[in-house]
Amino acid sequence: MRLFNLCIILVTFFSCAMDKSSKDFFDNCTESSVDLSNGIRVKDSLGYFSFMMPDSSWMPKRYVGENTTGLTIGDVSSDGHLFVFNASHAYYTGEWDWEKEQANVEKDFNVVETGKVHLLGQSRPLNIVHFQVDSPQTISYYISIIDTLNRSNYTLNLTTNYGEDYESRICEMKPLLESFTIHL
């Protein structure tokens, strides 16, 4: 009887202790038609990171700024939907403060949802931003990766046009995120 009571207590404890808010957005994604098996690995101009693109039709665009480097790829599907993946690297100074950064993002952008994504072996913050003034309107999934040792901030975003079924289009691009690699 004691063992039975102990089991009930443990089951109750673990079910209450589970963080239901940390559900990964991509848990609901099914298969993707973005095939990277014959893809092309592309790197940013300074060699901080790389990722796979499906083929040359995704037209990579690189940029280098004073403190940043970035790489964007994109394509338009046969039914007219926009698919864009961007990764950027920047150095930061001072101590990184997630709460302060999140408050700034929410102040500066139309954040419609926040969450977590499991990427590169860790849970990462996710901000879903609706750009209403764009034409067409777009929605972007921003994921932050902070390297406190090298004081580096990597921002990844998946963007598609806003409208019905945008979540499935974001899910289609999941393999692009998974192919992201940091080069130290």
List the predicted regions and their residue ranges:
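Sec-dependent bacterial lipoprotein signal peptides
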Residues: M1-F14
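N-terminal targeting sequences that direct proteins away from the cytosol to non-cytosolic compartments
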Residues: C16-T72, V111, L120-S123, T148-S152, ...
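Glycine-centered tight beta-turn/hairpin loop motif at sheet-sheet or coil-to-beta transitions
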Residues: L46-Y48, S77-L82, S135-Q137, R151
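A short acidic-to-branched-hydrophobic micro-motif
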Residues: T68-E99
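Surface-exposed aromatic
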Residues: H81-F85, N127, T155
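Solvent-exposed loop/turn segments at secondary-structure junctions
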Residues: A90-Y92, V133-P136, Y162-E164
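Short amphipathic alpha-helical segments
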Residues: W96-D97, E101, S168-E172
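Signature of long, low-cysteine stretches enriched in small and polar/charged residues
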Residues: E99-R151
